[in-house]
Amino acid sequence: MLLRTILAATATATAAVTVLLVPATAAHAEPTTTAAASSSTAEATTAEAAAGANPVIVVGGLIGISIAYEPIAARLRADGYRVSIYQLPNLGFGDIRESARALSSYVDQVREATGAAKVDLVTHSEGGLVSRWYVKFLGGAGKVDRYVSLGSPQQGTYVANIINFLGLGSCAGIVACQQMSIGSGFLTDLNAGDDTPGTVRWTTVRTWQDELVRPVDNAALADGASNVLVQAWCPLRIVGHLGLVLDGTTYSVVRQVLAGATIRPNCFAV
């Protein structure tokens, strides 16, 4: 029952094997006061940026189908971005390194189809780790401009450790679950040295109510990333792990990052 609950909650992998494209800085982003709604100037800046922007690939997480990420993809399309959704191979159950190799091929397909030199990655949960492995070890640093992770266990999550502790078949035989355990060999390799390599612009978004990434601060990166805690800006905002891809405030951060605008989450967005 516990495993079913956890797996259902993580139902968050994404996307298509086909390319569905529709035309249309190094400080932590933690404030001391709550931000107000985005100004009309910021909205205009975002719209202008989208017109000539990189293609955006939404990279999903463990267990899920493409449709789970259609809401955030639809928001991006409405803002003028060319968007595709990438579903992890085998629903993300397998080796994250293998998923990263598959993502590498997918990125090349998108670049060829669009003529773009680089893409932007908007990732959720396990998808953030898949994307980081691709950037760090598989040549993605020269092909990715912006990286945004939503609730990705960058330093692991003790939820995976608990499953192991309970003896549920070593994460019930799920390789990716084992790799997301705090202290795993996979995470040791991924986080060794600079955890934000290359010229990629790195941003993470996390929420206090994340029931799957615990401790919550394990969803942040250390070296040169903008790390956004939703409740640092919007203390009354309640957003869970799955809610990060549906939440308006979270999306306001995504669109600001993609537009190269200053990060000021809109606490009133729906």
State what each model feature region is.
Residues 62, 77, 91, 99-102:
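Secreted/periplasmic proteins that engage bacterial cell-wall peptidoglycan
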Residues 1-31:
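Secretory targeting and sorting signals
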Residues 73-93:
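Conserved alpha/beta-hydrolase
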Residues 136-270:
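Helical cap/lid subdomain of alpha/beta-hydrolase-fold lipid enzymes
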Residues 20-51:
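N-terminal low-complexity, Pro/Thr-rich disordered segments
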Residues 89, 93, 115-121, 160, ...:
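Surface-exposed patches in mature extracellular/periplasmic domains of secreted proteins
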